[in-house]
């Protein structure tokens, strides 16, 4: 984890792409914060080998934005550049899950099988709770066929039927599970009656005024 205030700020506010060797170039500079001066910003990016980043700093009414890019010089990073945020989606999923719990739709220790259609027919879900899925302690592992199943649009039950999907009983080990968070998404859709995108907009993005997410 970052160990200095500058690194913490950069890691939290920017979505960087790391490269072995490269040097960022300031493509848009707005004054208002020491980090947004060209020498300071380039020094931090060069030190950590970042070649593409967007940084937004806001303190009350004062707002400063700067960005860099050498990955694709013809299309440098700008205010509206889209970034693939990958597993940051898990944080959003966790927040929406906790909001649903606060709203009484289900409980943190509700069994996942009871919240999913046909879930009771999946032995791999025996004893697995929402808490386990959130904490990566469900005992469910990511199988090599996960990506293919997603691309082919196969239901989650296809993976739950695989004998090797369960590495251990729930609560025994920490096993990072993309599939587990996918199940949380299925639970959210089933219990709210909404697809993930409008659900996230309603319960997370709009209340936070995240209009470009």
PLM feature spans:
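Membrane-proximal basic amphipathic "stem/tether" segments
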Residues: 1-31
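Short, conserved catalytic-motif segment at the N-terminal edge
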Residues: 32-83, 105, 155, 161-164
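Short, charged, amphipathic alpha-helices and their helix-cap/turn boundaries
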Residues: 64-66, 146-170, 174, 194-213
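Active-site helix/loop module of the DD-peptidase/beta-lactamase fold
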Residues: 79, 84-87, 100-141, 145, ...
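Catalytic nucleophile serine of serine hydrolases
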Residues: 87, 175-178
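Short, conserved phosphate/pyrophosphate- and ester-handling motifs at nucleotide-, phospho-/glycolipid
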Residues: 90
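Well-ordered alpha-helical segments within folded domains of soluble proteins
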Residues: 93-94, 180-185
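Short alpha-helical "switch" segments that flank and position catalytic residues
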Residues: 97
């Amino acid at each position: 984890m970052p160990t200095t205030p500058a690194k913490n700020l950069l890691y939290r506010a920017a979505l960087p792409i790391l490269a072995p060797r490269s040097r960022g170039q300031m493509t848009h500079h707005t004054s208002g914060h020491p980090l947004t001066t060209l020498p300071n910003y380039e020094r931090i990016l060069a030190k950590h080998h970042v070649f593409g980043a967007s940084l937004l700093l806001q303190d009350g009414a004062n707002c400063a934005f700067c960005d860099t890019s050498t990955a694709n010089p013809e299309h440098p990073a700008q205010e509206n550049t889209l970034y693939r945020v990958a597993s940051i989606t898990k944080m959003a999923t966790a927040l929406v899950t906790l909001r649903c719990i606060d709203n009484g739709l289900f409980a943190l220790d509700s069994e996942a099988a009871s919240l999913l259609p046909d879930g009771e027919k999946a032995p791999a879900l025996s004893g697995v709770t929402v808490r386990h899925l959130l904490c990566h302690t469900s005992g469910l592992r990511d199988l090599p066929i996960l990506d293919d199943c997603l691309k082919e649009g196969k239901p989650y039950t296809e993976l739950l039927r695989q004998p090797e999907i369960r590495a251990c009983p729930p609560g025994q080990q920490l096993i990072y599970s993309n599939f587990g968070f996918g199940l949380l998404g299925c639970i959210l859709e089933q219990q709210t009656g909404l697809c993930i995108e409008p659900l996230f907009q309603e319960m997370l993005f709009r209340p936070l005024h995240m209009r470009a997410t």
